[in-house]
Structures are given as C-alpha cells and as structure tokens.
C-alpha cells in the first residue's frame, strides 16, 4: 500500500468513527428526556472539562489545582433600563461561567493565568492599591483590595481563569470574574461570607477600582443565582424573590450580534438624564420618589407634562416595570406564550421608545420572531450591541440557529454567535 493510500484510509476510518460517536451522542441526547439523565450528561461534561483544565493549571504552575470556584454570567429575562429608575429587574445566572481553578500557596503573591492569553499576571497583596491601570487583572485586584480594606487577609495563591462568558456580549463576564474572585479569596482566607456581600464587594471593585459605572444587578445575579429560577430583585433595597423559571420543552437561546461596542456609556448617560427630567416634571403633580412608582394609568393622566424623547423614555420605563410584574405572574401560571409576548413588547419598547437597539439587535430579534419554534425574543443589556434572548423549542434549536444565523449574516454582513443556555446556581465551590 502506498503511503498516500494509507493516509487516506486512516483519515476515512477517523471520519467514520467520529460520525459514529456523534450519532451515539445524538441518540443518547434524544432519549435523554428527564432531568436525572440530563444531570448525568452535565456532570460528565463538567468532570471532563475539569480534568482538562487541571492539566492546564499544572502545566502553568507546576502543581495541582485544589479547588474550582465558579460564578455565572447572567441574563435579564425582562426589565431593561429600569433599575436606575427604581424598578425591579428579573435576572438569572447562566451555565456560561467564570471558572477559577486555584491553589493556595501562602506568601503575598497572587499569580493569575487566563485561558486564551499568554503569560502570567502577578500582583502583590501588600500593594493592591497600585494595580488600577492593569489591562488584565484589574477586576481581580479591585476585589482583593476592597476585601483587604474590610479586614480579610488576602493570601497568596495561583489562579487559572477559564471564562466561558463571551467578553463584550452584555452577559456580564466582568461580574462573573469579580464574584468568582471574591469567593476564591474569602475561601482561602478562611472567613465566613454571604453571597450578597460578595456581590456588593464585586460591584464596588468595578465602580471604584476599575472605574466602570454599573448597578448591582449583574453581580447580584452572578452570586445569588439559583438553578431553574430567576431573581425578582429590587436594586434599591436588595429585596429579592426567587421565581421558578420552568420552560418545559422550551429553552432560552442567547444570540450575540457581535457588533463592537462604541459610545455605549455616553448614550447610557444621556438616557439617565432624560428619565430624570421626566421624573422632575411628574413630581410636580404626583408624590413619587422614582419613575417606577408611576402606574400606567397615572402616566396616561400626566404625560401631557412631557414631550418629545423625554415622554418616550418615561413611557418605556413605566410600561417595562409593569411588564416585569406581568412576566412573573405568567411564569407562576406556567403561561409561556404570554411570557413570549411580553418579551416581544419589551423589545419593541426598547426599539421605539428608549431607542437603544440598533439594526443588528433588531434584525436578530425580528428573524427569531419569524420562527414558529420561537415564543418571543428581545434584546438584553444596555443595548447598542450585545445579545438577544429567545424562547425556543428545544427540539428546534439547531434549525432555529441555522436559519436565524443565515438571515442575520445575509442582512448584516457578519456572523452572530448562539448559545443554548440553562439557568444555574450563582456561586459554587468544588474540591477537586
């Protein structure tokens, strides 16, 4: 047998074996219809991933990882651009996560390595106020700095960051990194902590150390998430309620439009000014502390005080707050069709009244809504790029992604990224 024929035969055998393995997986997944079997698959995938990452850790730090600390990225089911208006939000933690493989070393050095990034970032625990300019590692340094200011002893450790939350997607990769770091450092310091405190420390690190203006929702969901539940959260008081997010034969598909984020913060600040202007006008006739306290009926009676974009912005906030409560009731009643309708309404409002979508998010959402397998779709996050979420029938996800992805590419000129998600716990700690 000639060498070229041998190579072709080996390649053919490899391809056929790979097809057989893929077929076995597809068959197994098709018959895997209950939660117990799904949990077995998830456990096996996690164990395999941990084994690979432990090998990576050892190749970098020449020692074995002891623990993996994780925190979730997040979606906000509904309730966009209302948190700074006193409204309630409805986030949930995802299976897209920041996983920190760690080993306590003692001393005063924290060494960090990152998936997809060459080299090691090293910070000293007695110089934590000097790393604000770091391009990589400043979130971690900020968390360590504020924990130390609270009296937590920050001990030396080696950390490998494996983050599956897409960066720049609006799924809060920064919050997941911060919260996972916070639980890591608290565990290694041997101190008791509660998850709300982890969220608050993480938010403070992002605001005051990294210099990024954000509310508490992202870190709260990342820390406090609960499997198969969303969190109805009042960002002003931190009062919260877990609401079962049972989608049955449906799942949430996240689509990233992959548009570069430009000038998001400046547009965000303009929107805040506009709703504050609306509130001041409404307060001349109604004794309310925030726009979220205004009911749709009251708004109809006082909207004459507003005009132009200020009126549109206020209308979105008032109606979106009402939609949050309606969505909670729909979930409690098991009415997924109504939930989907509310997601669609939310997107229309963000597009027409708050004007934070853009052609990319509008295209993704519109193409999703054309699919019979989709109950509803809307943008999530600050807007002007980022992601949509869609409620899609599980058995139709592959076709949904293929058709929506093609339509989006044909319309926009570049590809979207899709993620079939599950709702998971926020913070987890696992000994390896």
Name these PLM-found stretches:
Residues 12, 17, 30-34, 50:
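Intrinsic-disorder-associated, low-complexity terminal segments enriched in Asp/Asn/His/Tyr and depleted
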Residues 21-25:
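Cationic, amphipathic, low-complexity segments that mediate targeting or membrane/lipid association
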Residues 26-34, 40-41:
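Short, positively charged and aromatic/hydrophobic N-terminal segments
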Residues 49-74, 99-133, 229-376, 391-432:
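C-terminal nucleotide
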Residues 53-68, 75-79, 84, 88, ...:
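Gly/Ser-rich oxyanion-binding loop with an adjacent helix/lid
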Residues 86-93, 271-272:
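Short Gly/aromatic-enriched secondary-structure transition segments
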């Amino acid at each position: 047998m000639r060498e070229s024929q041998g190579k072709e035969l080996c390649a053919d055998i490899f391809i056929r074996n790979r097809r057989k393995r893929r077929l076995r997986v597809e068959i197994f997944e098709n018959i895997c219809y209950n939660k117990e079997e799904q949990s077995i698959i998830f456990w096996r995938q996690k164990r395999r991933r941990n084994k690979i990452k432990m090998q990576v850790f050892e190749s970098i730090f020449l020692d074995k990882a002891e623990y993996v600390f994780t925190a979730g990225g997040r979606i906000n089911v509904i309730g966009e651009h209302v948190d700074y208006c006193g409204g309630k939000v409805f986030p949930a933690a995802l299976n897209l996560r920041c996983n920190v493989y760690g080993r306590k070393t003692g001393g005063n050095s924290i060494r960090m390595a990152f998936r997809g990034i060459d080299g090691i970032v090293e910070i000293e625990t007695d110089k934590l106020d000097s790393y604000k300019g770091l391009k990589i590692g400043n979130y971690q340094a900020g968390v360590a700095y504020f924990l130390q200011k609270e009296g937590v002893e920050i001990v030396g450790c080696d950390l490998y960051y494996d983050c599956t939350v897409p960066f720049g997607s609006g799924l809060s990769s920064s919050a997941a990194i911060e919260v996972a770091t916070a639980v890591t450092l608290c565990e290694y310091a041997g101190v008791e902590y509660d998850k709300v405190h982890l969220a608050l420390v993480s938010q403070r690190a992002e605001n005051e150390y990294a210099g990024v203006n954000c509310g508490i929702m992202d870190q709260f969901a990342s820390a406090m998430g609960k499997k198969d539940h969303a969190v109805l959260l009042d960002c002003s008081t931190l009062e919260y309620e877990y609401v079962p997010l049972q989608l049955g034969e449906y799942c949430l598909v996240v689509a990233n439009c992959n548009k570069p984020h430009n000038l998001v913060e400046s547009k965000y600040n303009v929107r805040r000014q506009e709703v504050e202007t609306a509130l001041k006008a409404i307060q001349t006739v109604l004794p309310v502390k925030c726009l979220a306290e205004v009911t749709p009926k009251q708004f109809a009676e006082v909207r004459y005080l507003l005009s132009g974009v200020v009126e549109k912005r206020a209308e979105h906030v008032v109606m979106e707050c009402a939609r949050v409560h309606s969505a909670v009731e729909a979930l409690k009643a098991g009415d997924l069709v109504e939930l989907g309708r509310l997601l669609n309404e939310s997107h229309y409002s963000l597009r027409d009244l708050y004007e934070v979508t853009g052609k990319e998010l509008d295209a993704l959402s519109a193409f999703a809504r054309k699919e019979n397998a989709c109950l509803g779709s809307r943008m999530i996050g600050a807007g002007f790029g980022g992601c949509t979420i869609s409620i899609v029938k599980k058995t139709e996800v592959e076709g949904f992604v293929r058709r929506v992805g093609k339509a989006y590419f044909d319309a926009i000129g570049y590809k979207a990224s899709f993620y079939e998600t599950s709702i998971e716990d926020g913070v987890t700690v696992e000994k390896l």
